[in-house]
Amino acid sequence: MEQQRPKVGLGVIIKKDGKVLLGKRKGSHGEGSWSFPGGHLEFGETLEMCARREVSEEVGIKIKNIKNAAFTNDIFKKEQKHYITVFVTADYSAGKIKIMEPDRCDEWKWFKWNALPKLLFIPVRNLFNQGYSPF
């Protein structure tokens, strides 16, 4: 029997004009909640490589000034999943925001940090509850 182990997720906190970019999740755990672009860290990948790849795949934009920010320990009881989520910050660089994965995201929207939507994806909620601020 294979032992369950936590997985490593990455969230990219993209900043522009004092706001952060969040997407409304669908088709996966956390459906209906708002989350940063991101995903799984692949074997041999740096955090910066993962951030650029995930943002390109999900949002279709370029980012710059990627910096390590924080991490959370996230347990999804209902789904029986456990993640260590590493967050990086990045500045918006170029491109038009698009829904690149319509089966996974309903919309992308900019929010002020002190006015985030109520229904946050567990890692984002945990990050906010830690008192973290990207500004």
Segment roles from a protein language model:
Residues 29-34:
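A conserved beta-turn-beta hairpin within the catalytic core of GNAT-like acetyltransferases
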